[in-house]
Amino acid sequence: MQQMTIFVISDSSGETALTVAQTAVSQYPTIQVSYQRFPFIQTDSILDGILNLAKKQRAMIFHTLVSPKLSQHVREFAAMNHLQQFDCIQPAMDVMHQATGLEPEGVPGLVHNLNDTYFDRIAAMEFAVTYDDGKDPTGLLKADIVILGVSRTSKTPLSLFLANRNLRVANLPLSPKTQLPDELWQVDPKRIFGLTNRPEILRKIRQERMLSYGLPADSAYSDTAKITEELAYAQKLYKKIGCLVIDVSNKSIEETATLIMESVDYDLIPHSLQD
């Protein structure tokens, strides 16, 4: 069965774009689709982080962004990176403009009330983008949750998904040859989650990754022995830290996120609000 990933990006709840995507997909029953939803996106930095993730996953994009600037950015990014995208709102607004001669308000979320939860979510999304992939280890000390894992264990999409649940997440890639930041040892183990996978599944994921770059599938990156070594190193580290370990093999992002949200001690992160 053919598989596809669809990103739903919106400056509001994303219900409209999700409904359009699901309606279109329903006409193709032989395709297995994974949806990743990113609501309340209103800044360039967050949008860029999501678009780069879409590029990595070769995802199709359905979006409702009332800002012409952000909407155009999605279209241009998709064209430049050979991604399929569908704008679910700008064409409709253009028709309204032509029919009435009036300019749109250009204000996102007019049909939704903004509250503290909304602003917490925006802050969490900004945090996830800033402290993705170990870019700044100081984020480990500021995060509600720290996610560890070797390459291609879904750290970034998981971080963004949890950010949509108002959790501030930093993630750190693991490799036997990479020195761990000192900040990691200052984080409460109850806030750390280690991801693992089966070598054969991870090998396939990495091979597909190489092919998406137009490179040979078989390389040191997708070598089974190297992957096994990386996973063993990660497992040893998790045991030393004393953190919860989650096997993400054959789990969706949503399933892994649910396990984390059910396991996290919210008394340690009082500023994070849950829906």
Swiss-Prot record:
The keyword Lipoprotein does not apply. GO terms for molecular function: ADP binding; ATP binding; phosphotransferase activity, phosphate group as acceptor; protein serine/threonine kinase activity. Pfam families: Kinase-PPPase. InterPro entries: Kinase-pyrophosphorylase, PPDK_reg. Bifunctional serine/threonine kinase and phosphorylase involved in the regulation of the pyruvate, phosphate dikinase (PPDK) by catalyzing its phosphorylation/dephosphorylation. Belongs to the pyruvate, phosphate/water dikinase regulatory protein family. PDRP subfamily. This is Putative pyruvate, phosphate dikinase regulatory protein. It comes from Levilactobacillus brevis (strain ATCC 367 / BCRC 12310 / CIP 105137 / JCM 1170 / LMG 11437 / NCIMB 947 / NCTC 947) (Lactobacillus brevis). The lineage of its organism: Bacteria, Bacillati, Bacillota, Bacilli, Lactobacillales.
